[in-house]
C-alpha cells in the first residue's frame, strides 16, 4: 500500500489509551495500548518502523483506525485486555479455544455457597479459580475438595429439600448438610473459607489449623471429631506432599514463562505457594502478529488474572519497568492489596522463572511435533479417501449435514465442518427447517443444502468457501435429493464441482450418485474412521440443537396452565435451573429447593415431568 493511501491518523490524540486497527469490512484486526496513541500508531507506518512480515501484512489490510482515550496507562491496559477478549483480533496473541477452558466457581454471592466446575459466563458476585488446562484437572480438584471439606452439592442458592430429609451426600460423608442444621451458617461459612484458602494454595495453614483442632477435640474427649480432623489433615498433607518443594523460603508467587515462534506461542504459569510448586498450567496461543515472547507474556498476564486468583507477586522475564508498572497497579486493584510484578535477577525465584521459560519452550516444541505428526497422518488419510471415493480433489474441507426431529416436530439440521481432517467449530452452522412438513428427511436435507449453497452464491462470507466434499448422514433417499439440488444450482457453471456422498449408519456404507452399489471402506481403516467421526459430530450437533428447542417447548408446556405458577414464578423457576434441560431433568428435591415454590406445586411439576 503506498504511503498516501494509509488510513487517516490526524484524529488520533497524543494521550494514553488504546488504538484499534480495522479492515475494510470494519472487522478488528489488532488492538494495542499506548501512552501516546498518535506516536505509537505512527510508528507502524514509517519506513524505519517494524519490518516483520506480519506487520507489513497488517499495514496492507488496515483501512480504519479508532481509539479509546484512557485516563492513564493502567486504564488503557484494562481496556486493551477487554477488547482483545471480546474481539479476538487476528494479529493479537490470544488463547486458543478460550471458551473451552474450565473454572472452579465458589458462589460467594449465595448465603450457602456452592463449589462446582463451569465454562459459562462469570457472575461478578462469585469467586472464580482458573482457568484450568483440562476438565480432568478440575474434576480431580473438586473431588479432593469435596472429600475434605464436605460442601453442599445440591443446586440452587438455598440448600436441601423442603421435606427436611438430608440427601445421600450427607450419609456418605460428602455434605455437611446445612439444610438440616447439621452445621450452622457460620460453620458452613468457615468450610467455604477453607475451600477458598485451598484454591489459593494456602494448604500448610489449613493443615496446621486441623492439627490444632484435632488436639483440642481429643483433649475434650470428642474422639469422633478428632478422627475426622485427623483424616482431613492427612488428605491435605497428601496433596501437599505430591508438590515439589522448590525454594527454601515460604514465599508465594506465580512465575510466567512465555515462548513464541512464528504464529504460535506457549505460556506456562508455575504457581508457588508457601515455598512449593502447587500447580503448573500451560496455554497455547495463536500469535498471528508474531509478537516476541516478552510481548506475549505482558499481553497475556492482564487477561489471565481477570479470572484467576492474583498472588502477591508475579514474576516475568521482561525488564521493561515502564510496561510492568501499569500491570502491577491493575493486579493490585484486582487483589485488593499491593501486587509486585517484576523480573527476578538471581536466587530461587530466578530459577523458578527459568523453569517456566524452559517449559514454555518445551511445551510449544512438543505441540508442534504432535501437530506435525497429526497433519502427516491426516494428509495421508485424506489422500486415500480421495482415491477410495473417486473425488476430484483432496477433501480438505468436508461439510456434513444431519437432520433431527421428534415425529416431525422441532425439525432442525446441522452443518459441521472439518478442515484438514479436524473440526472447525467456528464454522459450524445450524438451521431450523422452514419449508418441510413432518418427518421428511430427504426433503429437509435438500432444503438445508440449498439454503447453504444459495448463501455461498450470494457471497455470504459466513458460508464460504465451497466444500470439497458434502457428506450426508443418511442413505440413498437423502443422497438423491441433495444431488438434484446440486445439479440445479450448478447449472451454467455457477457452482464449482462439489461431490456429495452419503454414509449410511447400519452397514457404514458410502453411497455415490449414479452408482448402484455402495463403496465399502475397510472397517478398521483411518478413512472410514474419519467419515464416522465427521458424521457423528453432525449427529451430535443436530441433536443438541433439537434438544434445546424441544426443551424450551416442553418447559413451556409443563408450566403453562399449572395452578400456582404465574409469569413471575415461571421466570424464577427457569432462572434457578439456568437451562431448559436442567429443569426437565430436575428431581423432586431440586424442585423443592426453588426459592418461593410451595411443596405442593413442586410435586405437581415433578409429576408432569415424569408422567
UniProtKB/Swiss-Prot annotation:
Chain segments annotated as transmembrane: none
This protein's record includes keyword Protease: no
Domain GIY-YIG: residue ranges: 14-93
PROSITE patterns: GIY_YIG (PS50164), UVR (PS50151), UVRC (PS50165)
Highest taxon in the source lineage: Bacteria
GO MF annotation, one: DNA binding
Keywords: Cytoplasm, DNA damage, DNA excision, DNA repair, Excision nuclease, SOS response
Pfam families hit by this protein: GIY-YIG, HHH_5, UVR, UvrC_RNaseH, UvrC_RNaseH_dom
Function statement: The UvrABC repair system catalyzes the recognition and processing of DNA lesions. UvrC both incises the 5' and 3' sides of the lesion. The N-terminal half is responsible for the 3' incision and the C-terminal half is responsible for the 5' incision.
HAMAP family assigned to the protein according to its UniProt record, in alphabetical order: UvrC
Stated name of the protein: UvrABC system protein C
Protein's organism: Rubrobacter xylanophilus (strain DSM 9941 / JCM 11954 / NBRC 16129 / PRD-1)
